Amino acid sequence: MGFHLITQLKGMSVVLVLLPTLLLVMLTGAQRACPKNCRCDGKIVYCESHAFADIPENISGGSQGLSLRFNSIQKLKSNQFAGLNQLIWLYLDHNYISSVDEDAFQGIRRLKELILSSNKITYLHNKTFHPVPNLRNLDLSYNKLQTLQSEQFKGLRKLIILHLRSNSLKTVPIRVFQDCRNLDFLDLGYNRLRSLSRNAFAGLLKLKELHLEHNQFSKINFAHFPRLFNLRSIYLQWNRIRSISQGLTWTWSSLHNLDLSGNDIQGIEPGTFKCLPNLQKLNLDSNKLTNISQETVNAWISLISITLSGNMWECSRSICPLFYWLKNFKGNKESTMICAGPKHIQGEKVSDAVETYNICSEVQVVNTERSHLVPQTPQKPLIIPRPTIFKPDVTQSTFETPSPSPGFQIPGAEQEYEHVSFHKIIAGSVALFLSVAMILLVIYVSWKRYPASMKQLQQHSLMKRRRKKARESERQMNSPLQEYYVDYKPTNSETMDISVNGSGPCTYTISGSRECEMPHHMKPLPYYSYDQPVIGYCQAHQPLHVTKGYETVSPEQDESPGLELGRDHSFIATIARSAAPAIYLERIAN
């Protein structure tokens, strides 16, 4: 019996030991319950894209990561995340947050990454980020911030990355980043900044990359970036910068990349780059530069990449320092530099224009002439051969004036004729070839797609040619034919003579032949017959025949042989010498 009692006591002790363990496991499981419409992965909670208007409840206090992206949260209240003291990162981007309480981040001191981008935040209190001194990454980009408070980032000594991109900031307060000693990356691009105070970036001793692109700066002085000994890259592209000055009393040896593209820079002061001896990459494209001085290119001793396209290069002798520097430059360079002037070489590549028009060779010739201006034998003038057409008058004038004016033009073939570049010939040939190919293609497609129309067109053109040939042949047949007619124009007195006396002048006219006049000695009214009328002229004179008593000869009379013509019998015979048949006129006796 005692043995059974001991066994029961041992069983009870085991149950008492296991019961607290089970309760602890159950409590832990309840504590780690995942909120509705969320996804939990260990200590990471994802409540994304479910239109949450507030922070979900029942989030485990031991969660280390919380993502509330793409929801409809509009406001962050005081102590909103107080129960989540183990949070390391918090994503609140792509919401509609417009108001943030200054105590919204109380209780999450361990937070290292806070993303508030793509919201509608217009204002942040001075102490908003004081409860999170361990922040490494703070993203406030793509909001509507208009100002930064003077102590906005106070105490953020561990901050490494700060995004303020695409807001509406107009100024940067003095020493606003004073406590951000470890800041490595600062993005202030796409704002409305017009100027920078001298101490705006004071305290950023470890800053390596600074973005100021797409703002409204009109001038830049390197003195506005004091003692940024570790800054390697600065981006100032697409502002309104017209001038650059250095104003530094120290050497900025850490800067490697400088982007000034897309501005309105018209000129660079000669000593601007002297304080940047280690500059490796320089972007000056899409500005309004016309030339670069010799002193400036001499300061580019460490460059390995440069872009200069999209400027208004003046292809005169002022471009020569840059041309020779680029010719000897072995790094990565932009080769599409186009001349904006003078007018006769606009659109040419700078390198082609300089070599074609000998723009810089003249400068070398002038220097050579200067070195020989003091000859030992003045009786023998020094003659320097030129690669272009030699003109003694020009050479002589060069010796008389050893310092030519800047507007001096090179005498040579370029003044007599305009040079045609080889690439223009190639481009024209290609354009002509493409035009012919396009025409042939259109004809081929039309022939394949509409064969009946093409056949009709060919038949129409063939018929047109046939008609034209028929007209020409008809014109050739009609041209030798002559018009024959009898012109009888009696006056009143002659009519009376003919009717009374039976005689009078009669005029017969053959067009293109001859005109004859013959008197008639007839008795009573004579009768005439026309043999083989040609064009119906006898029919045309039928009324005259009826009036005067003329009648057509009978066939029996027409066949009478031995027709004799003579003045005694008053017969007239006219034979046409053309393609028309002969006409015989015969007097018939009553």
Curated annotation (Swiss-Prot):
PANTHER family: AGAP008170-PA (PTHR45712), INSULIN-LIKE GROWTH FACTOR-BINDING PROTEIN COMPLEX ACID LABILE SUBUNIT (PTHR45712:SF22). It comes from the Eukaryota. The lineage of its organism: Eukaryota, Metazoa, Chordata, Craniata, Vertebrata. It comes from Homo sapiens (Human). LRR repeats lie at residues 62-83, 86-107, 110-131, 134-155, 158-179, 182-203, 206-226, 230-251, 254-275, 278-299. SUPFAM superfamilies: L domain-like. Keywords: Cell membrane, Glycoprotein, Leucine-rich repeat, Membrane, Postsynaptic cell membrane, Repeat, Signal, Synapse, Transmembrane, Transmembrane helix. This is Leucine-rich repeat transmembrane neuronal protein 4. Glycans are attached at residues 58, 126, 291.
